[in-house]
C-alpha cells in the first residue's frame, strides 16, 4: 500500500497537468522519510494526496476570479448544505469570517448570475451549476492525470488495500 501511494505522490509531483502544487509541496515538507514506520508513511502519503487534490481543485476554479470564501459559499449552496445566510454562517463559523463577509459573498454570487435569491433563500442557477460541475470535472482531470503511473491491476490492488485498511482502522475504533 505504501509503495503504491508513494508512486502516486511522486507522479503527482512530476506531472505538468495541474497548474500549481503549492499544497502538495507544503505537505511534502513533513515527509518522515522512507525508513519511517509504515503507518507514518501511509499517513504522509494520504495527506500528500489530499493536498494534491486541494491543488487540483484550486486550479479548477481560480480562473473565475473569485476568492476562496466566495467559491466555498457557492459550493455550500450547490451541495444543498445551506440555503440561507444564517445557515451559511452557522455551518462555516469555524472559518472566522463575519456575517457581513458571507452576505457579500452571496451578493457577489447573485450578481455573477451563479446564485438566485428568493427572499432569504439562495439556490444555484443553471449557470452556477454548470460552472461548479465544470470545476469538479477539471479537478478530477488534474488529480487523476498522474494515475497512469499505475497499471489497471495496481489501481485495483490499491482500491482493495485502501478498503481493507479503512475497515481495519474502523474496527480498531469500535
Which stretches of residues belong to each language-model region?
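Phosphate/adenylate-binding glycine loop and adjacent helical scaffold
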Residues: 1-104, 141, 174
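Terminal interaction helix/tail motif
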Residues: 140, 144-174
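Minor-groove-contacting beta-hairpin "wing" of winged helix-turn-helix DNA-binding domains
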Residues: 120-129
Amino acid at each position: 500500500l505504501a509503495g503504491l501511494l508513494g508512486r502516486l505522490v511522486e507522479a503527482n509531483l512530476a506531472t505538468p497537468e495541474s497548474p500549481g502544487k503549492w499544497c502538495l509541496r507544503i505537505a511534502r515538507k513533513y515527509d518522515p522519510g522512507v525508513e519511517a514506520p509504515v503507518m507514518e508513511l501511509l499517513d504522509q502519503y494520504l495527506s500528500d494526496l489530499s493536498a494534491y487534490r486541494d491543488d487540483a481543485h484550486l486550479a479548477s476554479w481560480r480562473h473565475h476570479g473569485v476568492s476562496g470564501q466566495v467559491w466555498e459559499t457557492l459550493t455550500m449552496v450547490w451541495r444543498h448544505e445551506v440555503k440561507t445566510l444564517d445557515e451559511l454562517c452557522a455551518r462555516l463559523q469555524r472559518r472566522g469570517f463575519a456575517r457581513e463577509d458571507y452576505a457579500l459573498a452571496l451578493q457577489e454570487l447573485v450578481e455573477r448570475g451563479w446564485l438566485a435569491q428568493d427572499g432569504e433563500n439562495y439556490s444555484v442557477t443553471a449557470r452556477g451549476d454548470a460552472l461548479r460541475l465544470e470545476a469538479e470535472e477539471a479537478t478530477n482531470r488534474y488529480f487523476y492525470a498522474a494515475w497512469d503511473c499505475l497499471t489497471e491491476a495496481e489501481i485495483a490492488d490499491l482500491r482493495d488495500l485502501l478498503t481493507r485498511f479503512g475497515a481495519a482502522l474502523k474496527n480498531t475504533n469500535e
